[in-house]
Amino acid sequence: PEKIPQKLLEVVHIITGNGHSEEELPQQDADVFKQILSLLRIRKGTDFTYYKQTTIRRRILRRMAINKNEEPVTYLTFLRENKTEQDVLYQDLLIPVTAFFRDLKTFDNLCESVFPLIVKNKLPGEPIRIWVAGCSTGEEAYSIAICLKEYLDKTSAYTTGSLQIFATDISEPAIAKARTGIYTKSNTTGLTAQQLQEFFIKINGSYQATKSIRDMCVFAVHNFLKDPPFGKMDFISCRNVLIYMEPYLQKKALTTFHYSLNPKGFLLLGKSETTSGVPELYASVSKADKLYSRKDVQGRFFQTPTLRSEQSFSDMNTNTKTVNPKTDF
């Protein structure tokens, strides 16, 4: 609409004024927001209760404005009767922000400091296992695949094992797009001309990752906050996801990642994220890059992989490729 109703502006002012939206919102509106999140939890299985509520409510207000619902309670009624709007709101709350080689210096550090140590610790035939948690539409996973390939091609340091990059997200549309590996020209600005030429093919004005790069990455819908985690990971990247969560969920996620990592594994977070909530689990490798190593202490993770998760993981493994970096990688 051309003019957002005054009521929405008032609620936005309350939420953005000092960030304490729970205390400042009228109790009736606060209860309505909780009911909206409850609807999404029932439909999608994702609980946004411990996500940063200021961000969540801004997104809800945006959908209210688009649908010309002046009061939160009228939007709740509309939402209950409209499953499509529930799906749209859910996707809106996921806040996908990603890019190829975001923070380029971080990727340089991976090649200089992380990948050499991972390769050094590998026995002959032992796979390199990487998990990109919260991968959105795939740019981060493909960036890591390209970065790793460039490093291995340059050094010829790892020729006998398989490379397994697992990329997960709770958004089905995001995962579907990631699997295609197709991106518009504007989406590929983080790639060099050489990378674009070597690792992508042009299709109808867009660019698709080559099959060799796509085969390195296995994409799956997965919620690392509630689904059984993957294990024996050498490296986990979870960038710009934790910033949308309250400390309780951040600690839960970081504990899960500690459980998933090998004893000498690495964790990469976003520039505004930290492991300060669980200092006993991680040691800082690079403060600038928010790169951490796993401390060899017993974590607090309590969930064990189920038979279903082990089978799903096995199914994912069958899609990975054993490669020789110098030839058909």
Where does each model-flagged region fall?
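A short N-terminal interaction module
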Residues: 6-128, 234
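PAS-family sensory modules
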Residues: 296-329
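Conserved SAM-binding loop of SAM-dependent methyltransferases across substrates and taxa
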Residues: 137-158
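Conserved class I S-adenosyl-L-methionine
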Residues: 173-175, 179, 235, 271-289
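Extended basic-aromatic, gly/pro-enriched interface segments that bind polyanionic ligands
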Residues: 133, 154-235, 241-251
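A short glycine-rich, Lys/Arg-flanked "PGG" loop and its adjoining helix->strand segment in the class I
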Residues: 250-263
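Short "lid" loop at the C-terminus of a central beta-strand within the Rossmann-like core
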Residues: 171-172, 225-226, 272-276, 299-300
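Conserved beta-strand signature within the Rossmann-like core of class I S-adenosyl-L-methionine
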Residues: 263-271
